[in-house]
């Protein structure tokens, strides 16, 4: 292997020491490589690896760094000729598993557990990692605290009347959800500070103390209006001289009058004399009309004048920037009158928040369960209050190394300060990739060091890694051209200059000269009026955008590009369902990294929630009927109507079922034998489930329902079956988490879920296996750190999310609370109304200041998000957006006015929430970017669409959980049905046959038919048959079904090409299993598979392996003589040139190898079914079938099944 040639900057980053070092590592510059090599060099110099503190942003990054270090340390040891150095490297390898390599959260947990007595907590605390549990506890604390304050408890520091005013300021119509949202927002923000109580007590009201009037606002409040005024005056002066404004007439007089007041207006702004400023502006007439001209050049100037005047001044109905400023002044003058009342509300809010924070923390101490932020605060307290511990750690660690430093929070920064000796920090990151502001990371921490370390007098060191070893020059040049004109100190928080620009470092891989075929491509879908309107404020994506991208992807695949080398990046996962469906219709394999959206609204979960609601309360008609109509019981509308007419319309449906069973209803003759048997079977199961509610945990009950009704198998056989099954598993996990938190009872669980749905909340997505060769769809944020040959950025026209700028509170670290205040203007002399009150919600001065700060920070972060997205592409970048064909200003004409101010795009276009497409098109017009632009329509899509066989749509196989508001009504047609009720259908067997069956159902049906014809079924002496008594299950016991499902999921995730302990453990950690399940998955045992010849074969043929392979096949039932579809999923197969190697995992437990023959016999029919499906699908005659037995003693057994 050839020696890697280091750049001078990389070499410096690896070997420099004795000072704090900040490595600004641009995208693709090899920062992980540099960090690993620096650690290896430290070990060579004699520093033990456990004396290095190495903090990573995620657990995955820590695991990957460990694996990389293991490889690099081994390589260094092999190449070392120094025995002492080799010994040091060997020692480092031995201690690698114990080295402090991990997230800051993992370190603070370890520190807190080791010093629990210093903060008076139990060392056996657990982490509230499950959002459901922390939400439950927080909600209970909040509700109890609100109840206390409303009870007029005199011991509290807010009176009942004042507390009611506080709630009303943030909530509507006696609903406290608005107030609750405010409290949770402040709590989350405070928790990200290094000392929440201190911040709440000392900084929370700082804005109200600082900004009491308009004149207290900083220069930022007036800087834009000064610039706009100067621009307006210059426009008028130029227009008076170039003939745009006529030499005589009213227009010229108005312009001269405005210019006569020029100096007075500017002076009033400078002095913050807002009364004079407003009066002057309102006194002058800005309605200057210039008409048109036959002269083409003059006409263009007149048109430009009108456009600029509209932007700068506007009209009363459509104000421009100057009129908006005057409105802000008038608003400010009004809020000054209510400043004291607003401050009183803010003070009471501060008291309540502090009380809530302390009460919630005390509750968590009682539960001995904490959030990550709590543990971080405990760790800070330990180090601050205990110099002995702090100094011991400072002496222990030779160096403090931090990866992804740009995403550091103030809490983490405080930890680093306490651990460092002042000159041993090694920080690696890229300010241009700081995109986690929503997690309260502060890029300002990196930026302050970036600027100060660059000063000659600063003893610390800044090292820039600029070379990009990932991407072609076309991608890098385009990225540089965008950001050098987009970012500056004012907006972007830094200048994107020569030192920040990306430099191509992989000259040997890619040519230096640009090739037009690899220019980034902007694909704009021109949507016509017959299609859905573009939603300016939403991130909705149109079919046309996705189809345009799909056709380009299809071409790439035809040219030989592997699907796994293509990624689609989206703003949010809300469009995932639509993207997946359309790509599949083009026969493009696709995987959604973050799953399909709306877990709680997925068909299978909705059905199970209705089942739980019905079990909890069978008198709830909607859920009961929905359950009956679902695939679990399969009652059709005719049958439900027959039941419905057994009683009056106001009688509960459950009572009608009981009447039907007893044949005591109004129309008992309608309950035929078939329906009666169906009702009895339902009632038996349903009654049993209801009896078990108080005997077994909810998650056990769910699994009993899944298995008894074959519903788990059923949804697994549908389209997206794996995701559906994962959703059902997730519902069970949520139920278990709920109960493990100390909460009991189905009623409360159903209430919790209902509350989530009422608030349009969702539960966390579920982890499923990722196909190895498929186009990946993920959010921009999720893509950080990854790379793909071809990258498609979708939905670029969507607006930036500016909802945070409209919330009732906006917070900042410096100024604390900014809030809106609801004032009753009835007392104002200018307000005339017949209503008893005139409530107006207005922005306080601290709110205005925080809003301005947040808006600039948000736009700066959006720029960085775009930078991250661009730099994922290795070879080519595709940008996909949409324009209208009706409104000219929404099309490309709007960008004719885009210009540069110096080297930067004008603020008119930069300082906008209209989205990435708005920036790119503006820059395209202003600078002519090195990219290709293609506009296409729906008609062009249809004519150019590649003809491929679409996958069948199986969605109709299962209907949504329906709500039958009218099912209870009587139908006259039912009486006609009586005439045919006794008709005997000649193909009764076919009516009992499901049109779609899973392999398990086929196997069960075959077994039942064999019993009917009189065959005796032998029971193996090695297989003990018993009836499971669910009432005996303890809350912590794991069922075989759950373990089997978890083990199968792990085998689907595991990368067989990296079959080692580190890799498999990392995979297991990522899958999010419950700890009890995770601890029972024996990775060491699973790895014995790869000691076998078959395991080695799998490792060597990963590229030919298809895991989790779905199939469907038409078969004929020998008894019903009818055809039916078998759909299922086999665990995997390897497709070779002349044959297919089929394999399936089995987790059946056995202790004696003599039981293997019985297991093989048990699954022979199932494997033959899979084999038959593969033969028909691939037209291959030879299918070798193997069972991988994971449940045996000590190791994995591989057994071939003979025909």
UniProtKB/Swiss-Prot annotation:
Where does the UvrD-like helicase ATP-binding domain lie? 4-472
Recorded GO CC terms: cytosol; DNA helicase complex
Stored Gene3D superfamilies: 1.10.10.160, 3.90.320.10, P-loop containing nucleotide triphosphate hydrolases (3.40.50.300), PCRA, domain 4 (1.10.486.10)
State the similarity comment.
Belongs to the helicase family. AddA subfamily.
Question: Which cofactor does this sequence's record say it needs?
Answer: Mg(2+)
Q: Does the keyword Transcription apply?
A: no
Give EC number(s), comma-separated.
3.1.-.-, 5.6.2.4
Q: Which GO terms describe its biological process?
A: double-strand break repair via homologous recombination
Q: Which residues bind ATP?
A: 25-32
Q: Which residues form a coiled coil?
A: none
UniProt miscellaneous comment? This enzyme is a functional homolog of the E.coli RecBCD enzyme; unlike the RecBCD enzyme it degrades both duplex strands symmetrically.
| Role according to the record | The heterodimer acts both as an ATP-dependent DNA helicase and an ATP-dependent, dual-direction single-stranded exonuclease. Recognizes the L.lactis chi site (5'-GCGCGTG-3'), which stimulates homologous recombination. The RexA (AddA) nuclease domain is required for chi fragment generation; this subunit has 3'->5' exonuclease activity and probably also performs the helicase function.
Single GO molecular function: ATP hydrolysis activity
Q: Which domain of life is it from?
A: Bacteria
Q: What happens when the gene is disrupted?
A: Cells lacking this gene have an increased sensitivity to UV and about 300-fold reduced chromosomal conjugational transfer.
* Protein encoded by which gene: rexA
Asked if Isomerase is a keyword of the record, the answer is yes
Q: How does it assemble?
A: Heterodimer of RexA (AddA) and RexB.
Q: What is this protein called?
A: Exonuclease/helicase subunit RexA
Question: Which reaction is catalysed here?
Answer: Couples ATP hydrolysis with the unwinding of duplex DNA by translocating in the 3'-5' direction; ATP + H2O = ADP + phosphate + H(+)
Alphabetically list the UniProt keywords: ATP-binding, DNA damage, DNA repair, DNA-binding, Exonuclease, Helicase, Hydrolase, Isomerase, Nuclease, Nucleotide-binding
Which Pfam families does the entry link to? UvrD-helicase, UvrD_C
Cross-referenced InterPro entries: AddA (IPR014152), DExx_box_DNA_helicase_dom_sf (IPR013986), DNA_helicase_UvrD-like_C (IPR014017), DNA_helicase_UvrD/REP (IPR000212), P-loop_NTPase (IPR027417), PDDEXK-like_dom_sf (IPR011604), Restrct_endonuc-II-like (IPR011335), UvrD-like_ATP-bd (IPR014016)
Q: Which residues form the UvrD-like helicase C-terminal domain?
A: 503-785
């Amino acid at each position: 292997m050839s020696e890697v040639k280091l750049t001078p900057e990389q070499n410096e980053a690896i070997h420099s020491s004795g000072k704090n070092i900040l490595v600004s590592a641009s995208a693709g510059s090899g920062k992980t490589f540099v960090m690993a090599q620096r650690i290896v060099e430290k070990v060579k110099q004699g520093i033990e690896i456990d004396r290095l503190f190495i903090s990573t942003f995620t657990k995955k990054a820590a695991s990957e760094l460990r694996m990389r270090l293991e490889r690099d340390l081994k390589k260094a040891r092999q190449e070392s000729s120094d025995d002492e150095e080799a010994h040091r490297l060997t020692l480092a390898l031995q201690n690698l598993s114990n080295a402090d390599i991990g997230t800051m959260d993992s370190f603070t947990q370890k520190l807190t557990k080791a010093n629990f007595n210093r903060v008076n907590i139990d060392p056996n605390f657990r982490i509230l990692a499950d959002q459901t549990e922390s939400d439950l506890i927080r909600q209970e604390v909040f509700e109890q605290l609100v109840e206390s304050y409303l009870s007029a408890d005199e011991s509290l520091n807010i009176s009942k009347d004042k507390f009611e005013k506080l709630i009303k300021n943030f909530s509507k119509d006696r609903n406290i959800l608005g107030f609750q949202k405010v409290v949770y927002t402040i709590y989350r923000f405070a928790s990200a500070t290094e000392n929440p109580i201190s911040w709440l007590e000392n900084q929370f009201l700082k804005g109200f103390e600082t900004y009491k009037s308009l004149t207290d606002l900083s220069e930022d409040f007036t800087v834009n209006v000064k610039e706009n005024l100067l621009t307006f005056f210059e426009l008028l002066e130029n227009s008076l001289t170039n003939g745009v404004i006529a030499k005589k007439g009213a227009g010229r007089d108005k312009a001269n009058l405005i210019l006569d007041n020029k100096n007075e207006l500017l002076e009033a702004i400078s002095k913050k004399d807002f009364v004079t400023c407003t009066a002057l502006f309102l006194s002058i007439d800005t309605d200057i009309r210039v008409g048109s001209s036959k002269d083409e050049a003059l006409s263009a100037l007149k048109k430009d004048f009108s456009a600029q005047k509209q932007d700068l001044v506007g009209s009363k109905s459509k104000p421009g920037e100057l009129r908006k400023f005057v409105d802000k002044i008038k608003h400010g003058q009004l809020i000054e009158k209510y400043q004291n009342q607003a401050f009183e509300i803010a003070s009471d809010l501060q008291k309540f928040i502090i009380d809530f924070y302390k009460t919630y923390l005390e509750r968590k101490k009682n539960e001995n369960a904490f959030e990550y932020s709590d543990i971080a605060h405990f760790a800070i307290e330990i180090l601050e209050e205990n110099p002995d511990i702090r100094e011991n750690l400072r002496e222990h660690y030779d160096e403090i190394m931090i990866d992804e430093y740009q995403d550091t929070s103030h809490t983490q920064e405080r930890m680093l300060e306490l651990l460092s000796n002042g000159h041993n920090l090694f920080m690696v990151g890229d300010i241009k990739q700081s995109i986690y502001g929503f997690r309260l990371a502060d890029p300002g921490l990196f930026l302050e060091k970036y600027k100060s370390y660059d000063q000659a007098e600063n003893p610390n060191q800044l090292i820039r890694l600029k070379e990009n070893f990932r991407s072609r020059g076309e991608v890098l040049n385009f990225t540089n051209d965008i950001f050098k004109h987009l970012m500056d100190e004012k907006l972007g928080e830094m200048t994107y200059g020569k030192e920040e620009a990306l430099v191509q470092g992989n000259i040997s891989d890619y040519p230096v000269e640009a090739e037009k075929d690899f220019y980034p491509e902007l694909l704009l879908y021109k949507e016509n009026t017959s299609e859905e309107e573009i939603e300016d404020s939403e991130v909705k994506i149109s079919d046309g955008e996705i189809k345009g991208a799909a056709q380009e992807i299809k071409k790439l695949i035809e040219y030989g590009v592997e699907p796994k080398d293509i990624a689609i990046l989206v703003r949010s996962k809300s469009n995932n369902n639509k993207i997946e469906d359309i790509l599949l219709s083009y026969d493009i394999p696709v995987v959604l990294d973050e799953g399909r959206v709306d877990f709680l609204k997925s068909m299978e979960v909705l059905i199970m929630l209705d089942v739980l609601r019905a079990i909890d309360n069978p008198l709830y008609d909607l859920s009961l009927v929905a359950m009956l109509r679902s695939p679990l019981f399969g009652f059709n509308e005719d049958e439900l109507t027959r039941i419905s007419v057994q009683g009056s319309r106001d009688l509960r449906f459950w009572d009608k079922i009981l009447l039907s069973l007893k044949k005591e209803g109004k129309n008992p003759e309608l309950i035929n034998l078939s329906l009666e048997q169906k009702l009895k079977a339902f009632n038996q199961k349903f009654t049993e489930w209801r009896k078990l509610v108080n005997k077994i945990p909810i998650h056990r009950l769910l699994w009993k329902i899944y298995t008894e009704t074959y519903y788990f198998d059923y949804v697994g056989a549908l389209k997206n079956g794996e995701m559906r099954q994962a959703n059902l598993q997730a519902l069970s996990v949520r139920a278990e988490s709920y109960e493990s938190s100390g909460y009991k009872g189905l009623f409360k669980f159903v209430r919790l879920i209902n509350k989530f749905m009422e608030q349009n909340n969702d539960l966390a997505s579920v982890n499923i296996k990722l196909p190895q060769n498929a186009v990946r769809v993920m959010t921009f944020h999720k893509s950080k750190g990854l790379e793909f040959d071809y990258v498609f950025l979708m939905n670029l026209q969507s607006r930036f999310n500016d909802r945070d700028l409209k919330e009732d509170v906006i917070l900042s670290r410096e100024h604390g609370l900014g809030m809106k205040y609801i004032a009753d203007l009835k007392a104002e002399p200018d307000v005339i109304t017949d209503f008893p009150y005139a409530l107006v919600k207005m922005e306080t001065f601290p709110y205005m200041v925080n809003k301005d700060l947040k808006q600039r920070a948000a736009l700066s972060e959006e720029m960085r998000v775009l930078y991250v997205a661009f730099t994922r592409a290795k070879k080519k970048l595709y940008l996909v957006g949409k324009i209208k064909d009706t409104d000219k200003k929404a099309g490309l004409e709007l960008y004719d006015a885009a210009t540069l101010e110096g080297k930067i795009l004008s603020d008119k276009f930069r300082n906008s929430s209209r989205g990435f497409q708005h920036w790119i098109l503006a820059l395209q017009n202003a600078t002519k970017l090195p990219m290709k632009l293609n506009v296409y329509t729906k008609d062009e899509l249809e004519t150019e669409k590649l003809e491929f066989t679409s996958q069948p749509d199986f969605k109709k196989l299962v209907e949504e959980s329906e709500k039958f508001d009218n099912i209870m009504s009587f139908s006259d047609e039912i009486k006609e049905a009586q005439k045919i009720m006794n008709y005997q259908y000649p193909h009764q067997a076919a009516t009992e046959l499901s049109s779609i069956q899973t392999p398990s159902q086929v196997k069960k049906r075959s077994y039942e038919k064999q019993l009917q014809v009189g065959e005796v079924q032998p029971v193996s002496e090695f297989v003990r048959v018993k009836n499971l008594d669910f009432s005996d299950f303890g809350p912590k016991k794991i069922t075989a079904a759950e373990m089997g499902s978890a083990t199968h999921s792990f085998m689907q995730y595991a990368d067989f090409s990296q079959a080692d302990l580190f890799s498999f453990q990392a995979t297991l950690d990522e899958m999010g299993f419950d700890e009890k399940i995770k601890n029972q998955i024996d990775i060491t045992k699973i790895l014995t598979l790869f000691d076998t010849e078959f395991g080695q074969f799998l490792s060597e043929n990963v590229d030919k392996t298809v895991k989790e392979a779905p199939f469907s096949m038409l078969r004929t039932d020998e008894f019903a003589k009818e055809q039916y579809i078998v759909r299922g999923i086999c665990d995997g197969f390897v497709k070779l040139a002349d044959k297919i190697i089929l394999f399936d995992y089995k987790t059946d437990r056995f202790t004696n190898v003599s039981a293997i023959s019985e297991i093989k016999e048990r699954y022979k029919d199932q494997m033959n079914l899979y084999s038959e499906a593969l033969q028909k699908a691939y037209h291959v005659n030879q299918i070798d079938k193997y069972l991988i037995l994971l449940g045996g003693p000590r190791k994995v057994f591989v057994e071939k099944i003979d025909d």
